[in-house]
Design a protein with these regions (language model features):
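Hydrophobic, well-ordered beta-alpha structural blocks that scaffold small-molecule cofactor pockets
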Residues: 1-16, 20-34, 38-43
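Nucleotide phosphate-binding/pyrophosphate-handling subdomain across enzymes
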Residues: 6, 11-14, 30, 240-344
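Phosphate-binding loop of NTP-binding sites
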Residues: 13-14, 25, 29-33, 47-56, ...
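Conserved beta-strand positions in the Rossmann-like core of class I SAM-dependent methyltransferases
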Residues: 16, 39, 124, 348, ...
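Adenosine-cofactor binding site in Rossmann-like domains, unifying the SAM/SAH pocket
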Residues: 40-47, 233-240
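Short internal beta-strands
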Residues: 41, 203-206, 320-323, 343-352
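C-terminal helical cap/extension that packs against the catalytic core
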Residues: 333-388, 423
Length: 424
């Protein structure tokens, strides 16, 4: 690693770390490495507002929204604040490649990491994927020439100041996290902020051309490179088995654009894409019984993901769709309109938003069942007819589960234990 860690300059030595999750714990580790005194402020255990005047720096975890009173209090008292990513970035000079987008961030981050590794570079993926950058830096980090591939969520991007990626890859944009950002424009501007901080090239999914027009921001800068539409690369994409889904086709098209611009040879690119293993709980078939199939897309937590799954599976027989979960301020009418455009036979509503959507059941073209919880879904499946059961819920898991992983694992267990009738 670069052994000359540079602690951020503050007027007072005490660092206030807000949040005791992964980011907060990582920031604390880095403070210890830098010999900076700190205290962790956990909202779940703090009954009173902290005394901000004592801090020289406040490091906020991503969960603190823009209108959180503690953020506002830090601003009112003129205490410098930083994201965990900025705090870590102040301690090294390594190049950073950022990856953001409504969907596809994690897949692109993992592919990009493996691509650069296969090209002979020292590389590590960090950020929103669960590997905390501050903790990595505190534990030694990469050598000065190593590259960090940093997955950046909109929560992290909105407050970035000093992290300047060498390149940024932006997959796509669709409504999400409206309850956190306040409105769609704020959500877009959080993502776009990352592009403005980028030092060299911004690689964008083709669909972002329309997005930039919608928000009237320039899309013709020399530093901005768009991937071609996936449809123009059909012959090239067909060689990769994972490219059955529209979302993955667009991801691969973006990676290809990046690789060609940086002169990574075609053989290395092809090898990387061929060996790539999709992260768990992204759209994949988890069981087949004759022509009946079961699909897990528990990570599909917004309308854009649902539409991508619908587009990928629309030709399969007798579609049964599991929809619902925790809400984030979504327009429920958008889900109704989208599902009505596809040949879905039955919609099984679950969770918090499932109850809300049940009140609009008559607006769906498909048959609607209020299953409430995942185990109940399997009680309603056809007994003498093949079907396609899809968990692509469009909403978070937090109303009934700890994570989308836990939701997906339960679904796959239910599917494994499912005993079909002789006619399925």
């Amino acid at each position: 690693m670069d052994t000359t860690l540079r602690p951020p300059r503050t007027s007072k030595p005490l660092v206030g770390i807000f949040g005791n999750g992964l980011s907060g714990k990582g920031a604390a580790r880095l403070c210890e490495k830098l010999h900076l005194p700190y205290e962790i402020i956990d909202e779940r255990q703090q009954s009173q507002s902290p005394h901000f005047e004592q801090y020289g720096l406040c490091v906020f975890s991503p969960g603190f929204s823009p209108n959180h009173p503690w953020r506002q209090r830090a601003e009112a008292t003129n205490v410098p604040s930083a994201t965990e990513l900025d705090f870590a970035a102040s301690c090294f000079n390594n190049p950073v490649i950022a990856v953001t987008g409504t969907n596809g961030k994690t897949s692109v981050t993992e592919i990009l990491t493996q691509l650069l590794r296969n090209s002979g570079q020292e590389v590590l993926s960090v950020g929103n994927n669960g590997t905390v950058l501050s903790e990595v830096v505190a534990d030694g980090g990469l050598s000065p020439d190593g590259v960090y591939i940093c997955e950046v969520s909109s929560f992290q991007a909105q407050f970035l100041k000093s992290l300047h990626p060498t390149h940024t890859l932006w997959t796509n944009f669709a409504p999400d996290h409206i309850n956190w950002h306040g409105n769609l424009k704020n959500y877009f501007e959080a993502k776009y902020r990352l592009l403005k901080l980028t030092e060299k090239t911004c690689f964008c999914g083709n669909s972002l051309k329309e997005t930039f027009q919608t928000f009237t921001v320039p899309s013709s800068a020399a530093s901005m490179v768009f991937a071609p539409p996936a449809e123009e690369l059909n012959d090239w994409l067909e060689q990769f088995p994972l490219c059955f889904s529209q979302g993955q086709r667009e991801n691969f098209a973006l990676i290809r654009t990046f690789a060609r611009r940086l002169n990574i040879d075609e053989a290395t690119l092809r090898h990387t894409l061929e060996e790539f293993q999709q992260p768990p709980h992204r759209l994949h078939c988890c069981r087949r019984i004759g022509t009946t199939s079961f699909w897990n897309d528990s990570k599909g937590t917004n309308l854009h993901a649902v539409q991508a799954a619908l587009e990928s599976l629309k030709d399969l027989p007798n579609l049964w769709w599991i929809l619902g979960g925790g809400g984030k301020g979504e327009d429920l009418n958008g889900f109704i309109q989208t599902l009505n455009r596809y040949p879905v036979q039955t919609i099984c509503l679950v969770g918090e938003t499932g109850r809300e959507l049940m009140q609009k059941a008559s607006e769906f073209k498909a048959n609607v069942i209020h299953a409430e919880i995942l185990p109940n879904v399997l009680k309603h499946l056809p007994t003498h007819k093949a079907f396609t059961l899809v968990l692509s819920p469009g909403f978070t898991s937090w109303d009934q589960f700890k994570s989308f992983e836990e939701r997906g694992e339960l679904f796959e267990k239910l599917v494994r234990d499912y005993v079909p009738s002789s006619g399925s």
